[in-house]
Amino acid sequence: MTPTANLLLPAPPFVPISDVRRLQLPPRVRHQPRPCWKGVEWGSIQTRMVSSFVAVGSRTRRRNVICASLFGVGAPEALVIGVVALLVFGPKGLAEVARNLGKTLRAFQPTIRELQDVSREFRSTLEREIGIDEVSQSTNYRPTTMNNNQQPAADPNVKPEPAPYTSEELMKVTEEQIAASAAAAWNPQQPATSQQQEEAPTTPRSEDAPTSGGSDGPAAPARAVSDSDPNQVNKSQKAEGER
């Protein structure tokens, strides 16, 4: 800047240092006394607190409101688009544009339906394939579990170890032993009777021995009869020769 221009400009106003300090330094916060919880002051504080809570609740409600939208376009955006369309096309142009849009949508309705049907069929086929894969995996997984649960075959050469007796089997064995001992104590003649029954069938055989035909049996008297009657023997021989 030229010196003439500096001379023409007005001089800045004089500001004292105290005013500058006041402007720079923030005001000191004084400690306010605690409110008295008596009388009207309590009511005023209560109303203030309630109003603050209501304001906070209204803010949160406003934030949580979900705005409906069509193809990602909300209500205010649609209004703005409508106003711009009115300014650009005018009322008559908007009516014609709406008619053309309706005609195009009606013309594309069958194609849209076909696309929807194709998408549904594709989805159903995908679900079926996924379900078939899941079923096959489950069926393949079951035999593995069965094979894991199967026990190894026992070797024929190895003798099986006797299974430990259970408490019920031990009780049965003890009861049987007690019953047998009691029967033997009360009936001591049972072994003698059993021995007699075993010896009984052997005695008839000794009685039937002479009748079966031995050296000293009934064959001896037959021989005596044949020796005592030689005439009868001759007659029988003659009769056989005549025949």
Curated annotation (Swiss-Prot):
Composition bias (Polar residues) maps to 135-152, 187-204
- Topology versus the membrane, per the UniProt entry? Single-pass membrane protein
Annotated spans, Disordered: 129-165, 178-243
**Record Pfam families:** TatA_B_E (PF02416)
The record places the transit peptide at 1-67
Q: Where in the cell is it found?
A: Plastid, Chloroplast thylakoid membrane
Q: NCBIfam families in the record, alphabetically?
A: tatAE
What does the similarity note say?
A: Belongs to the TatB family.
Query: What is the recorded name of this protein?
Result: Sec-independent protein translocase protein TATB, chloroplastic
